[in-house]
Amino acid sequence: MGKEKNPRRVAENEAMAKLRMLRTSPQKLNLVAAMIRGKKVGQALTDLTFSNKRIAQDVKKCLQSAIANAENNHNLDVDELIVAEAWVGKNLVMKRGRPRARGRFGKIMKPFSELTITVRQVEEQA
């Protein structure tokens, strides 16, 4: 509970961005995250822009934040970045209910997720 004892340190050629409390299930978020893993950031941004999934816009926002972190905080070249990791985790689950027939009560779970995107600079081979 609380803070991690040893937070993960990023390498010299990496940058990271996190989004927490995303209002979607981890399973649905992982479908979009799997779509961009290992791709160049330009191609990943294009894929997210034209995706029909609702959560794709939030993933795009997190990826743009990771790119900005790489450029401004780590002085990395944006044209040589790839999506090294797109990690999805489970967050809290809001529990709601709905009255059902014969006096019963149906449980409704409203899951939240978190997303961590790591971008890495790779040198192009000629």
UniProtKB/Swiss-Prot annotation:
What keywords is this UniProt entry annotated with? Ribonucleoprotein, Ribosomal protein, RNA-binding, rRNA-binding
What Pfam family is a match for this entry? Ribosomal_L22
Question: Keyword Acyltransferase: yes or no?
Answer: no
Q: Would the keyword Ribosomal protein be found if you checked this record's keyword annotation?
A: yes
* Gene Ontology molecular-function annotations: rRNA binding; structural constituent of ribosome
The record's listing under CDD domains reads: Ribosomal_L22
GO CC annotations? Answer: cytosolic large ribosomal subunit
**InterPro entries the UniProt entry points to:** Ribosomal_uL22, Ribosomal_uL22_bac/chlpt-type, Ribosomal_uL22_bac/org-type, Ribosomal_uL22_sf
Q: Which Gene3D superfamilies match?
A: Ribosomal protein L22/L17
Q: Name one GO biological process term.
A: translation
Concerning its family, UniProt says: Belongs to the universal ribosomal protein uL22 family.
On subunit structure and binding partners, the annotation says: Part of the 50S ribosomal subunit.
- Biological role: This protein binds specifically to 23S rRNA; its binding is stimulated by other ribosomal proteins, e.g. L4, L17, and L20. It is important during the early stages of 50S assembly. It makes multiple contacts with different domains of the 23S rRNA in the assembled 50S subunit and ribosome.
HAMAP family, alphabetized: Ribosomal_uL22_B
What protein name is recorded for this chain?
Answer: Large ribosomal subunit protein uL22
Species of origin reads: Ruegeria pomeroyi (strain ATCC 700808 / DSM 15171 / DSS-3)
> What's the gene?
rplV
